[in-house]
């Protein structure tokens, strides 16, 4: 997540006018989370309005009584344990005697019905009692209490939240990515995250923090509406106590665990603003694959987790998808950028490689340790210089790429371990290696190198005929040729055993140019024609419409003029999906764009090529207005969206938009699923 409008400082300034606005918005009804966020802007919530805000944030406002159909019988095998835990909890709350019995029945009923409806066995270790504490303080009726509890469990408590569970293996990888020294210290003591953070995650800090602090954390967390954000809050708690933890080298494992487990208890209300600001910063420095590859941990899903993906306990480090690697280094300004290190043998690298990748032959680690050490030194210097010079190959984040074949990547894993032992932060591995890169480029390739994707692969051996050796001299401008020349020189330099290898590599990086604007005349500004397709697009056998006329009338002048920061919009908490694409006009011209999907709308941001990192809001369409999504057999990546109204008399088309979307199948599937959710919500 990036800084900006998605999470503003938790300040108390601004008088009480915003509180009146919030109260009026809540009283008016029909208020959504985005409206609330715009009013609240990260400020502490008034206690009397918290219940209404949380219900909207949890999407249970106006929801019916889920317990209405239940007979109310408390007869689970573990009922005595449930009753005992609830009774102890009520005693801790110091509830007036006349209300205690009713509250006890509410809590016991909520837990019992949840267990019955979800076929879950209760145990004290689950932290459910603590999770209910901040909700009980809202003094909700039983039906709302259950709905809120269910929503929190469903959206914010990850699957397998148990000892040795997958969520904690993932947390260890996040710690290692940002704080390798701390991770190494805990690993040495054989302290795993589940041993101290089980109740952090299982209760969303309610187990250890005071009610006031817990409510303040939940105020921000529920408005953030990002279940993964809890990982960064947990990370900051560790980071803030890092020096104390590292000083406990002589303490026993049990003593360190006890200290770690209780650290959230020291939080007070004044700490919350800094906690969220720091979490936001670390969040912005984390690859998007951290979320995307583990999205199934949260929410309702019928999809199983593949065995080979599930064992994060065996992962060397955080994995990053090849699609993110390609997209990240096209970003301008803020955001995660990767310095890709290709660890395959020289002959494989020469046959074909990612054009921006630095070659580090992992075989050297055993065959020639001194040359390997020199190459590593050169690599780190080259990374530094590439960042300073603004090279498109530059990035703070080291991503190692192997072949994708386990037996061949053994040496690369040793290289990875070497960097991790040196406590190098921001170390990741490319998921699936070069094989996955080849497959991804094949999937998004439209019509060979001329489509604009061929420039991603470079070759230093002159071989041709497969995607691993796509012609490097595609017509992508002088800076692409310069990039390939740079990679070739780096490869030759790294093969040289001369002591001057470091200086050579650095000079090559320094002499590389940053991407330049390709507009050379006013005629170029209308976009690049989509090759191989006639100016008038027909999708399958669909009827044609005068889309230029529709396009020009489908948005206001104000919309067309609004300029936004692309990365800020992509990282908004309500953005569920982001698809880099090209908007295709009837003239055949294409414009680099981004499709962003929220719970209810789809936005098209068209890049402003003369203002890097900025875009116009080209269109904003309600998902429930999509009446048809079609593609062409010869060009399945070319997707047409038709918007309008459906009625008994037929479909009235009001707007048509066409996009060239890499991995179009994934994009349309995600959009269709979101449309169905909108329609289901409207029907209910």
From Swiss-Prot:
It is found in: Golgi apparatus, trans-Golgi network; Cytoplasmic vesicle. Residues 334-446 form the Rhodanese domain. Changing residue 50 to A: Fails to inhibit LPS-induced cytokine production. Residues 559-684 are annotated as: May mediate the interaction with FKBP15 and WASHC2. Its main location: Golgi. One of its GO terms (biological process) is vesicle-mediated transport. One of its GO terms (cellular component) is trans-Golgi network. The modification Phosphoserine is found at residues 300, 469, 474, 507, 556. Keywords: Cytoplasmic vesicle, Developmental protein, Golgi apparatus, Phosphoprotein. The modification Phosphothreonine is found at residue 514. Residues 44-225 form the Rab-GAP TBC domain. Residues 514-558 are annotated as: May mediate the interaction with C17orf75, FAM91A1 and WDR11. Disruption phenotype: Mutant mice exhibit increased inflammatory cytokine production and recruit more inflammatory cells to the peritoneum, when challenged with different pathogen-associated molecular patterns (PAMPs), including LPS. PROSITE patterns: RHODANESE_3 (PS50206), TBC_RABGAP (PS50086). Residues 514-684 are annotated as: May mediate the interaction with WASHC1. PANTHER family: TBC1 DOMAIN FAMILY MEMBER 23, TBC1 DOMAIN FAMILY MEMBER 23-RELATED. Directly interacts with GOLGA1 and GOLGA4. Interacts with FAM91A1, C17ORF75 and WDR11; the interaction recruits TBC1D23 to AP-1-derived vesicles. Directly interacts with WASHC1 and WASHC2/FAM21. Interacts with FKBP15. Putative Rab GTPase-activating protein which plays a role in vesicular trafficking. Involved in endosome-to-Golgi trafficking. Acts as a bridging protein by binding simultaneously to golgins, including GOLGA1 and GOLGA4, located at the trans-Golgi, and to the WASH complex, located on endosome-derived vesicles. Together with WDR11 complex facilitates the golgin-mediated capture of vesicles generated using AP-1. Plays a role in brain development, including in cortical neuron positioning. This is TBC1 domain family member 23. The lineage of its organism: Eukaryota, Metazoa, Chordata, Craniata, Vertebrata.
């Amino acid at each position: 997540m990036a800084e900006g409008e998605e999470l503003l400082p938790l300040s108390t300034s601004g008088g009480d006018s915003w509180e009146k606005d919030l109260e009026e918005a809540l009283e008016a009804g029909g208020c959504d989370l985005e409206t609330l966020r715009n009013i609240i802007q990260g400020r502490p919530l008034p206690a009397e309005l918290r219940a209404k805000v949380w219900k909207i944030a949890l999407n249970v406002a106006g929801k019916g009584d889920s317990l209405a159909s239940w007979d109310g019988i408390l007869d689970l095998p573990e009922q005595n344990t449930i009753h005992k835990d609830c009774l102890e909890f009520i005693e801790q709350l110091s509830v007036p005697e006349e209300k205690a019995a009713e509250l006890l029945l509410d809590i016991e009923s909520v837990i019992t019905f949840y267990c019955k409806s979800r076929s879950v066995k209760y145990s004290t270790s689950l932290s459910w009692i603590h999770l209910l504490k901040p909700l009980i303080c809202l003094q909700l009726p039983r039906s709302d209490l259950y709905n809120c509890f269910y929503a929190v469990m469903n959206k914010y408590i990850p699957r397998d939240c148990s000892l040795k569970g997958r969520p904690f293996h993932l947390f260890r990888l996040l710690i290692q990515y940002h704080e390798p020294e701390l991770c190494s210290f805990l690993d040495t003591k054989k302290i795993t995250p589940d041993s101290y953070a089980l109740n952090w995650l299982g209760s969303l800090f309610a187990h250890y923090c005071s009610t006031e602090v817990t409510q303040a954390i939940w105020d921000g967390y529920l408005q953030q509406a990002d279940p993964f954000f809890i990982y960064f809050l947990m990370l900051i708690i560790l980071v803030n106590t890092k020096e104390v933890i590292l000083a406990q080298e002589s303490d026993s494992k049990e003593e360190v665990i006890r200290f770690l487990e209780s650290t959230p208890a020291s939080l007070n209300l004044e700490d919350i603003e800094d906690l969220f600001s720091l979490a936001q910063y670390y969040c912005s420095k984390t690859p998007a694959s951290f979320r995307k590859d583990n999205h199934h941990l949260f929410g309702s899903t019928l999809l199983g987790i593949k065995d080979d993906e599930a064992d994060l306990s065996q992962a060397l480090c955080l994995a990053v998808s090849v699609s993110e690697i390609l997209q990240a280094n096209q970003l301008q300004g803020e955001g995660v950028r990767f310095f890709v290190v290709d660890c395959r043998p020289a002959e494989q690298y020469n046959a074909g490689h990612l054009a921006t990748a630095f070659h580090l032959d992992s075989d050297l680690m055993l065959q020639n340790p001194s040359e390997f050490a020199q190459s590593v030194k050169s690599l780190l210097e080259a990374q530094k210089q590439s960042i300073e010079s603004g090279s498109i190959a530059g990035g703070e984040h080291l991503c190692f790429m192997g072949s994708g074949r386990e037996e061949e990547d053994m040496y690369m894993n040793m290289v990875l371990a070497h960097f991790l032992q040196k406590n190098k932060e921001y170390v990741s591995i490319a998921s699936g290696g070069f094989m996955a890169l080849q497959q991804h480029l094949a999937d998004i390739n439209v019509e060979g190198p001329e489509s604009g994707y061929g420039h991603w692969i470079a070759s230093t051996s002159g071989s041709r005929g497969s995607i691993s050796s796509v012609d490097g001299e595609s017509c992508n401008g002088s800076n692409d040729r310069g990039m390939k020349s740079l990679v070739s020189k780096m490869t030759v330099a790294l093969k040289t055993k001369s002591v001057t290898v470091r200086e050579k590599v650095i000079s090559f990086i320094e002499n590389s140019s940053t991407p330049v604007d390709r507009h050379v005349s006013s005629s170029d500004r209308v976009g690049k024609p989509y090759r191989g397709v006639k100016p008038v697009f027909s999708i399958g056998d669909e009827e044609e419409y005068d889309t230029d006329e529709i396009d020009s009338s489908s948005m206001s002048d104000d919309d067309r003029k609004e300029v936004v920061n692309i990365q800020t919009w992509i990282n908004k908490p309500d953005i569920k999906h982001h698809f880099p694409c090209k908007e295709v006009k009837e003239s055949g011209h294409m414009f680099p764009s981004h499709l962003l999907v929220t719970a209810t709308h789809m936005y098209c941001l068209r890049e402003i090529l003369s203002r890097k990192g900025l875009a116009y809001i080209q269109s904003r369409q309600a998902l429930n207005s999509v009446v048809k999504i079609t593609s062409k057999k010869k060009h399945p990546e070319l997707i047409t969206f038709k918007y309008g109204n459906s009625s008994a008399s037929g479909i009235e088309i009001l707007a048509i938009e066409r996009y060239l979307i890499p991995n179009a199948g994934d994009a349309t599937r995600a959009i269709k699923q979101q449309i169905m959710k909108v329609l289901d919500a409207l029907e209910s």
